UniProtKB/Swiss-Prot annotation:
Residues that bear Phosphoserine: 1513
Disulfide pattern: none
Recorded GO CC terms: actin cytoskeleton; cell cortex; dendritic spine; FAR/SIN/STRIPAK complex
Compositionally biased tracts (Low complexity): 395-407, 1613-1627
Its job: Regulates the dendritic spine distribution of CTTN/cortactin in hippocampal neurons, and thus controls dendritic spinogenesis and dendritic spine maintenance. Associates with the striatin-interacting phosphatase and kinase (STRIPAK) core complex to regulate dendritic spine distribution of the STRIPAK complex in hippocampal neurons.
ANK repeat residues: 702-732, 736-765, 769-798, 802-831, 835-864, 904-934
PANTHER family reported for this sequence: CTTNBP2 N-TERMINAL-LIKE PROTEIN, FILAMIN/GPBP-INTERACTING PROTEIN
Biased composition, class Polar residues, residue ranges: 385-394, 576-586, 1552-1563, 1571-1588
Name of the protein in its database record: Cortactin-binding protein 2
Predominant localisation class: cytoplasm
Coiled coil as UniProt keyword: yes
Localization: Cytoplasm, Cell cortex; Cell projection, Dendritic spine
Domain of life according to the entry: Eukaryota
Length: 1642
């Protein structure tokens, strides 16, 4: 249509009016378009469209009509015939439009109005149509939602009905079961009653049986006691009868012997011998090996001392000689000296054996006792033997002990010395005497502990520890019998033949009226008791050097220091040996190694005594005060202890002391031997020349034996004299083939060996068994002798009859110095013995690792035989060499020698494995050529015969050691408290063998993890081997093998139970896997295992914390600072985040640090911006929000969170809160369900208004004395140590363990002391101690770290806490603030720091005292002396009101050693002071202030005039009380180390609380009570006060700020005297009206 465009254009100018008027018009017509249906709307629309089209037609018609009318009006009245009209037309056409007037305006205006109205109606209808369409769409949508809700409602209703049916069924079942259970309960109750009745009956029966059993037991005990008593009586009777039988037999034998001797005497007298009558008896010299000197007058009395050896009988043999015998004549005042030998000193009746030569077993070579010293008046004392007045009756001991022992009579068995192998030639005993004579002599000689001595005196001896019954009864009868028999037997000059001394028998004692002979007893460990009447032991095996060659003589200890009291006890082999009385008569001397002048000298005229010292193995012997032989140190393990060991200085000596000797008639044990020379060589003769000349010329027939004795004893003087004689055969060998050089070398007498070698003695002469002197010296470990012999070209590869070389013997006895010398000399290591053993076999057989290392690694020098000049460097060099052995050194022995088999097919590995010598086996296994699979003749490998430990070692011989490490993943950097946590820790090394399967490998990994988790969570330092673990149970921290997320072998991932084609051994070698890494499950997997391992917080507790966060949404972690609150909150948030993300919810962590400037508005913005707080009209999103508020302690909880308490408790729209926006508008918000809030507070407890917030949150308290914090530090440091030691747990005595335990104790003690002081704000969590350095061998680093921690963290916190507490209740204007503390407050702080430092930190430090003192200065407050402090004086009576405390500020110097100022502190009172005046410090005007120094400079407390300390603070008083109790606490460690010296320690005053002051002044003239401090050396402080005033008024003493001691019971008068006489104290009587004192009130 032509009018479409015009008709459809709306007229917007009138639209608002029509729109406003439309509702009114619609309302008038009651026509509501909104109520029309869709079809009606369509009908209406079509009608309106038709109307519009009709209107268009009408408009067009009207326009056409208008045009016609216009033309008619304008041109109708004109025609062409009228020119006037044409002109008028033109005129009208040319005029302007404005001037023209419409011809007809009325119809057009009407049409335009109609058209405008139509346009408006069209626009209105289009708007209504659009609104109707939108409403229709909304209606359809709501209908669809309604239908969905109806369906859901139907489902829920159906489900509800179903649940109701199920619940009904369950209820019915429960009712039925309840009925059944009630019936069962009744039945069980009846049964229980029956059982209880039966139980009562059984109890009655049991009690009756117990009574009967007790009665029977009592009867049996009584019967057993009776039996024991009878048996004891039987034993006693048997011993008495046996002793009586032996006495009778001995008596009979002695009488027979006397008859035979008398017959021989008569025959000799008839022959007309020219010997003096009564002085010398004939004797055979052909078969004798003893020197006999017969004496007359009181009967020939002799003393004999021999040596007992240990019970080791391996190298012993039957008797081959008897020692040198010298009968002596006792004189009054000169009792004989019994020379004790090592072990039990056995003797024959008429024989004194000064020159005993024998071979002792291993135990005789073990000497480790220190020489004790008798007083100068003491006579000679030997090793285990008694001094004068006490005969030796000592049992054998593996360790020689000085004879400073009490005369205890004890008989402990030991083999007789002469039944042992004796390498020196000696003639057999006299063959004609009955062996029973010998037993009789041992029976009656010296068996009583209290027999009278020669002077008639009695030496008291304590009861013996092991005395046979014979020594307890019939003392008189025994004495008579002993005297009679001994007098008869002692007349004979030769010892009885074939009767070796019986074990346990005492040496020969003197008879008649001689003093009692005390016997000392030294228990032998492991020795079985042998009764006195038993026969001698069975002779041992044949001689040989397969065991340690023993010195052919007894061993006796030389007493080195004559200044020490002889009453000291010596501890040897766990047996205490008491010392004898020092009342020793004259006639004997004490031998000193270095100088004879140190010992007591004889007090009688020169009467020669015979003393041939037989020194074993290089012990010093003093001969003629000129000879000295050094004892060289050598280390010999086990029973093969070298006799020349530096620990043993032993001189075996047999001494015969006589008052009269006639050398001209003395005959030697060998024909022609000179007794005078023996006397001279003994070193006891005052005059040498007369004695040498008195005997006249003597033949040299017996000199070789004397030469051997001198060489064996180490008597350099005698040896040099003998070597200077002509015609002497220095290479003479005794029956066993032992030469003088052999004896000297075997006993380690280096000087004697040098003399003999210089005299051209044969160096390679061998004995009957083929052993050379070098063999003997090497076996005994005398490396100096070995060095000399090698220098003189001794055959270092000489093999004995059994094939033993010197190197073999040295290895057999573990003498590593000798081994080293021989190896450097180029000895052959491959020489084999008769049974196929090499030196390596010998070293392994004894388990000596050092010897084996030398054999395998020590290289001989290129230039051959080179001897060291300094043997003292041997041990150091050996240690260096052992270190090289551990490193890159290669063994020098070939594989054939290592794998050499003996006659039975055993290699060295077989021997080490079978004996369990794991260390030796490890050394052998280091040799690349070892064949552990080699089999012996029984087809057994070393593994077959090995012990368990050695089997494990052999199984792991070729194993690959792969470290197993635990990783917790990457720890995010940040301030979460995880700075000290380690990402990886080595827990152990896995041994992967060729036969290891993947199952075995998987089990090993699981077991290693389980062991490690349980080891780090255990309480003590126990190694993994000492702990029994259960692989199935979790550790106390909750970790197990199931906590593993993944395992990587090198870089290849692997899971438990997984198998590869290659074996683990091949897999590790192929892939070059250097380690096995175990990654624990962490927060990324929604687990907390890695958090547990990193922080050592038990897994169960972390899971509980996570449950609290998920359940309550609002959790706050609070505890002391450093309790890992931030770390725990962050890790829980990470775990919760990944759990939510795994469930399909997006999650975000928001972290905010709260400080003092953090306001509530900032917190609101934080919540709103992160969609925690959302408007009430807005629906929550699916996103989870976790908010962490850190450091809430820095702000007020009530102010910060007060408005959020309700909304946080209810996460819903039911608890909205209104907040204003920045533009001033307010809106309601609420916390939605997907919001979690966690907070951290570094505060031990809440105070004040913060408690109002407590009930609205879930609180997790991390107490320092409760889990998880209590054990966290211990577990963390323990794991740190295990990681440092590569998975091994060190022993508890390791310095690292002690250091870690000290650091742990410091943390606990610090918190304990701070808790006692009532300063919880100073408590410390374990975080600060996690960085404790673990450096093995460097405990100083830990102490330095502790000092830095103390200065940077602990001390400032303690100072702040104590100052805040001391001033918390101080009145304003009277006290000092913490920013400007007074001197008194500073004193309290310094005292507290000093007490804490000494009681909690320095106490228990593993450093030595000297090292600790060097580090003490590094600690702040460590040098504060507690002695220089002020204390409160007691208030004077009747002057309580406004009492003033006067403190003298002028320190005085002490007059003693110490100069430390002390204080005079009288209490002053002033009349007129108000009653509410608080006690203050005031200073005297006259006090000099010029000499004052600060506390920091002179460590003395000086209180200035301007600084006054208010004492009215209750908290301050309580603090001082706590300091006082901590100082005085016995349960705490000693704090005496706080002060500069012990005298400086001041105890805290134990007075009561602050007194209540009265305003009444009764006696203003009364002198003040004051407290005086006495000089520091007096250990007490004087107190002068009026006791009456205290009792009358009951005024309690004001508590002292710092510890000042007071005497417990000091009287006023005494104190007054002390104080008046003291140079550093004053007593001032002060008048209340004194003008010098002007108390002021601030």
């Amino acid at each position: 249509m032509a009018t479409d465009g015009a008709s459809c254009e709306p007229d917007f100018s009138r639209a608002p009016e029509d729109a406003a008027g439309a509702p009114a018009e619609a309302a008038k017509k009651e026509f509501d378009v909104d109520t029309l249906s869709k079809s009606e709307l369509r009908m209406l629309l079509s009608v309106m469209e038709g109307e519009l089209e009709a209107r268009d037609l009408v408009i067009e018609a009207l326009r056409a009509r208008r045009k016609e009318v216009f033309i008619q009006e304008r041109y109708g009245r004109f025609n062409l015939n009228d020119p006037f009209l044409a002109l008028q037309r033109d005129y009208e056409a040319g005029a302007s439009d404005k001037e023209k007037k419409p011809v007809c305006t009325n119809p057009l205006s009407i049409l335009e109005a109609v058209m405008a109205h139509c346009r408006k109606m069209q626009e209105r209808m289009s708007t209504q149509l659009a609104a109707a369409e939108s409403r229709q769409k909304k209606l359809e949508m709501e209908k669809l939602q309604l239908q969905a809700l109806e369906q859901e409602h139907k489902k829920l209703a159906a489900r509800l009905e179903e649940e109701r049916g199920k619940n009904k069924h369950v209820v019915l079942m429960l009712v039925k079961e309840c009925k059944q259970l009630s019936g069962k309960v009744l039945e069980e109750a009846q049964k229980l009653e029956e059982v209880m009745a039966k139980l009562e009956e059984e109890k009655k029966k049991t009690s009756a049986l117990e009574e009967e059993l007790a009665t029977e037991k009592r009867r049996s005990t009584e019967m057993e006691a009776q039996m024991e008593k009878q048996l004891s009586e039987f034993d006693t009777e048997r011993e008495q009868l046996r002793a009586k039988l032996h006495r009778e037999e001995a008596h009979t034998a002695d009488l027979k012997e006397e008859i035979d001797k008398m017959k021989k005497m008569i025959e000799q007298l008839k022959r007309g011998t020219d010997s003096k009558p009564g002085l010398s008896l004939p004797r055979k010299t052909k078969d004798r090996r003893s020197i006999s000197i017969s004496v007359a007058t009181e009967g020939p009395m002799t003393r004999s001392v021999a040596c007992q050896t240990d019970l080791v009988m391996e190298s012993a043999e039957p008797v081959k000689k008897l020692p040198l015998t010298v009968p002596v004549k006792p004189a009054a005042g000169s009792p004989p000296v019994a020379a004790g030998a090592k072990g039990n000193a056995c003797a024959s009746a008429a024989a004194v054996r000064p020159g005993v030569e024998r071979q002792v077993s291993h135990g005789d070579l073990i000497g480790a006792s220190l020489p004790a010293a008798p007083p100068p008046s003491a006579n000679r004392i030997e090793e285990n033997g008694p001094s004068t007045g006490s005969t030796a009756d000592l049992t054998s001991s593996p360790t020689p002990v000085p004879s400073t022992v009490s005369p205890a009579s004890g008989h402990t068995p030991a083999p007789p010395p002469h039944s042992l192998h004796s390498p020196c030639a000696n003639a057999p005993l006299h063959p004609g005497l009955n062996p029973r004579i010998q037993a009789a002599r041992f029976r009656f000689q010296g068996s009583n502990a209290n027999d009278p001595d020669q002077n008639g005196n009695t030496t008291q001896s304590p009861p013996s520890r092991d005395v046979s019954p014979t020594s307890r009864d019939n003392l008189v009868a025994k004495q008579l019998a002993r005297n009679t028999v001994t007098q008869a037997l002692s007349r004979f000059t030769s010892p009885p033949a074939g009767a070796p001394p019986r074990p346990g028998a005492p040496p020969t004692g003197d008879v008649g009226t001689y003093p009692p002979v005390g016997r000392t007893s030294l228990k032998t460990p492991g020795g079985a008791r042998v009764d006195r009447g038993n026969p001698p032991p069975i002779p041992p095996k044949k001689p040989g050097l397969s065991q340690t060659p023993s010195p052919p003589h007894p061993q006796l200890k030389v007493i080195m220091d004559s200044s020490r009291a002889s009453s000291t006890g010596i501890k040897a082999d766990n047996k205490t040996v008491a010392s004898p009385p020092s009342t020793l008569p004259q006639g004997s001397r004490v031998m000193n190694e270095e100088n004879l002048s140190k010992s007591s000298s004889p007090q009688l005229p020169p009467k020669p005594s015979i003393d041939l010292t037989v020194a074993p193995a290089g012990c010093a012997v003093s001969a003629l005060a000129t000879s000295q032989v050094g004892a060289w140190p050598a280390e010999t393990p086990g029973l093969n202890q070298s006799a020349c060991s530096e620990r043993s200085l032993v001189i075996p000596t047999t001494t015969a002391s006589s008052s009269s000797i006639h050398p001209v008639n003395a005959s030697s044990r060998r024909a022609g031997a000179s007794d005078s020379l023996l006397v001279t060589a003994s070193g006891w003769s005052p005059s040498l020349t007369p004695l040498l000349m008195s005997g006249g010329p003597a033949p040299l027939a017996g000199r070789p034996t004397l030469l051997q004795q001198a060489a064996a004893q180490g008597n350099v003087t005698l040896l040099s004299m003998l070597l200077n004689e002509e015609g002497l055969d220095i290479n003479y060998s005794c029956e066993d083939g032992h030469s003088a050089l052999y004896s000297a070398a075997k006993n380690g007498h280096t000087d004697c060996v040098r003399l003999l070698l210089n005299a051209e003695a044969q160096v390679n002469v061998a004995d009957t068994n083929g052993f050379t002197p070098l063999c003997a010296a090497a076996a005994q470990g005398h490396f100096k002798c070995v060095e000399l012999l090698i220098a003189y070209d001794a055959n270092i590869n000489h093999a004995a009859d059994g094939g033993q070389t010197p190197l073999y013997l040295a290895c057999k006895n573990g003498n590593k110095e000798c081994i080293k010398l021989l190896l450097e000399a180029g000895t052959d290591r491959s020489v084999k013995t008769r049974d196929g053993w090499t030196p390596i076999h010998a070293a392994v057989d004894t388990g000596n690792v050092d010897s084996l290392k030398l054999l395998m690694y020590h290289r001989a020098p290129a230039h051959g035989n080179k001897l060291r000049e300094e043997p003292g460097l041997a041990i150091f060099d050996l240690d260096q060499e052992e270190e090289r052995h551990e490193g890159t050194s290669k063994p020098v022995v070939p594989a054939d020698l290592i794998n050499h088999a003996d006659s039975e097919g055993w290699t060295a590995a077989h021997i080490a494995a079978s004996k369990g010598f794991k260390n030796c086996l490890e050394v052998l296994c280091r040799h690349g050529g070892l064949e552990p699979e080699r089999r012996d003749k029984c087809n057994r490998t070393a593994h077959d015969v090995a012990t368990d430990d050695c089997k494990h070692l052999l199984e792991n011989l070729n194993a690959l050691k792969i470290p197993l490490r635990i990783s917790v993943g990457e720890i995010e950097p940040g301030n979460y408290g995880a700075d000290d946590f380690e990402c990886e820790n080595t827990i152990c090394a896995l041994n992967i063998r060729k036969q290891t399967s993947w199952d075995d490998f998987s089990k090993a990994v699981s077991q290693a993890l389980t062991n490690h988790f349980q080891a780090i969570s255990s309480d003590g330092w126990w190694s993994l081997e000492d702990m029994t673990f259960n692989s199935t149970t979790d550790s106390s921290i909750g970790l197990s093998a199931s906590s593993v997320r993944s395992i990587t072998l090198g870089t290849v991932p692997w899971s438990a139970g997984q198998s590869f084609a290659q074996s683990p051994w091949d897999f590790v070698r192929t892939n070059k896997a250097e380690q096995v890494t175990v990654l624990l499950s962490g927060p990324q997997e929604g687990c907390l295992s890695s958090v547990t391992y990193a922080s050592m917080i038990p897994l169960q507790m972390l899971q509980n914390y996570l449950r609290l966060v998920e359940q309550y949404h609002n959790v706050i972690f609070h505890g002391p600072e450093g309790s890992l609150q931030d770390y725990i909150a962050h890790q829980l948030a990470l775990c919760l985040k990944h759990r939510q993300m795994a469930a399909g919810f997006p999650c975000e962590i928001v972290r905010a640090e709260v400080d003092a400037d953090f306001s509530k508005e900032q917190l609101v913005d934080l919540f709103i911006s992160n969609a925690c707080l959302i408007p009430v009209k807005q629906s929550p999103a699916n996103k989870k929000i976790i908010v962490i508020l850190e450091n809430l302690e820095k702000s007020s909880l009530s102010e910060l969170l007060g408005d959020f308490l309700g909304p946080l408790e209810n996460h819903s729209t039911e608890s909205p809160c209104t907040f204003q926006k920045g533009n001033g508008t307010s809106e309601c918000y609420y916390f939605h369900e997907n919001c979690f809030l966690m907070g951290t507070i570094a505060k031990a407890c809440l105070q004040g208004s913060d408690l109002l917030v407590q009930q609205h949150f879930r609180w997790v308290q991390l107490r320092w004395d409760g889990e998880p914090m209590q054990g966290l530090l211990r577990r963390f440091l323990r794991r740190k140590v295990v990681n440092k030691f590569r998975g091994q747990v060190p022993s508890p005595c390791d310095p690292v363990c002690k250091t870690v335990d000290w650091a742990l104790a410091v943390w606990r003690q610090l918190n304990s002391c701070l808790a006692r002081l009532g300063t919880p704000e100073a408590l410390l969590g374990p975080k600060y101690f996690l960085s404790c350095p673990v450096i093995p061998g460097h405990a100083q680093a830990t102490v330095k770290w502790m000092s830095k921690l103390w200065n940077a963290v602990i001390a400032p916190r303690v100072q702040e806490a104590i100052l805040s507490r001391a001033s918390v209740k101080r009145q304003p204007g009277l006290g000092q603030t913490t920013k400007n503390p007074s001197q008194g407050q500073q004193a309290v702080v310094r005292a507290a720091l000093s007490i804490l430092l000494n009681k909690a930190v320095l106490h228990g430090c593993p450093l030595q005292r000297a090292e600790l003192d060097q580090h003490t200065a590094d600690f702040k407050g460590g040098s504060f002396p507690l002695s220089i402090v002020s204390s409160y004086g007691s208030c004077n009576k009747k002057k309580e009101s406004g009492a003033w405390r006067k403190v003298s500020t002028s320190p005085r110097k002490k007059s003693g050693r110490f100069s430390s100022p002390t204080w005079n502190k009288p209490d002053l009172s002033e009349e007129g002071i108000k009653s509410n005046t608080i006690l203050q410090l005031n200073c005297n005007r006259n006090a000099s202030l010029s000499n004052q120094k600060s506390l920091e400079n002179d460590l003395s407390l000086t209180l200035d005039l301007d600084q006054r300390l208010s004492l009215g603070s209750d908290d301050e008083a309580d603090l001082v009380k706590e300091l006082q109790s901590m100082c005085a606490s016995k349960s705490e460690s000693d704090i005496s180390k706080i002060a500069d010296s012990r005298d400086d320690l001041r105890r805290f005053d134990s007075s009561g609380n602050n007194p209540v002051f009265s305003a009444t002044v009764n006696n203003p003239r009364m002198p003040v009570s004051q407290k005086e401090v006495s000089p520091l050396s007096s250990h007490q402080t004087t107190e002068c006060s009026n006791s009456k005033s205290k009792t009358e008024l009951g005024v309690s003493r004001v508590k002292s700020f710092l510890p000042v001691p007071r005497s417990k019971a000091t009287q006023c008068s005494q104190n007054t005297k002390r104080s008046s006489s003291s140079s550093n104290t004053r007593q001032i009587e002060i008048n209340n009206n004194s003008r010098d004192l002007e108390p002021t009130q601030k």
